[in-house]
Design a protein with these regions (language model features):
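Tandem repeat scaffolds
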Residues: 1-176
């Protein structure tokens, strides 16, 4: 999907179940749109505005969401894993309950106050990419029941008060 020239908004639209595979939507304003069960496989959404979107059940395998604004988005039950790139994205206040985040890269992402309750960062597949939280800010994030075993973090990662990444089975990454 490509928008017509000079059209850079899907804000507030209803796109339920829409096939957005390979869509080129970098920088597009999609705030408060309804993408319930939409497919974003290999989509380019770099810098897109997806704040307060309904993304429940959507799939994002191998999508580029670098620096995307997903503040307050409802991503519950989503498949956000499979090498999806959230580097530098803002997911503050997002609902990621029961989302599959295995293989996603949250390096430098803001997950302040996000709800990752029962989210799954563990893949059952061999040779699967690790889930990265290097330099991510998880201040006040809810992690109850989240399966984070094998996910990586580093010294810059900020966790909620009282959360112990080692007890959750996370791996400390040393290096660049």
């Amino acid at each position: 999907m490509r928008l017509p020239p000079n059209d850079c908004s899907l804000a507030g639209t209803v796109q339920q179940g829409r096939d957005m595979m390979f869509a080129q939507l970098a920088g597009v304003d999609m705030a408060e749109a309804d993408f319930y069960w939409a497919m974003f496989h290999d989509a380019v959404l770099e810098g897109a505005i997806l704040a307060r979107c309904d993304l429940r059940g959507a799939t994002f395998n191998s999508a580029n969401l670098r620096r995307a604004d997903l503040r307050g988005a409802n991503c519950g039950l989503d498949n956000l894993g499979g090498s999806t790139d959230f580097i530098g994205a803002d997911l503050s206040g997002a609902d990621l309950r029961r989302a599959n985040i295995a293989g996603a890269d949250f390096t430098g992402a803001k997950l302040i106050g996000a709800d990752l309750s029962d989210a799954n960062a563990v893949s059952e597949l061999p040779n699967w990419r690790l889930t990265w939280f290097r330099g991510a800010d998880l201040t006040n994030a809810r992690l109850a029941g989240a399966r984070l075993s094998g996910a990586t973090y580093d010294d810059r990662t900020v966790f909620p008060r009282g959360f112990n990444p080692n007890e959750a089975g996370m791996i400390r990454f040393i290096g660049r």
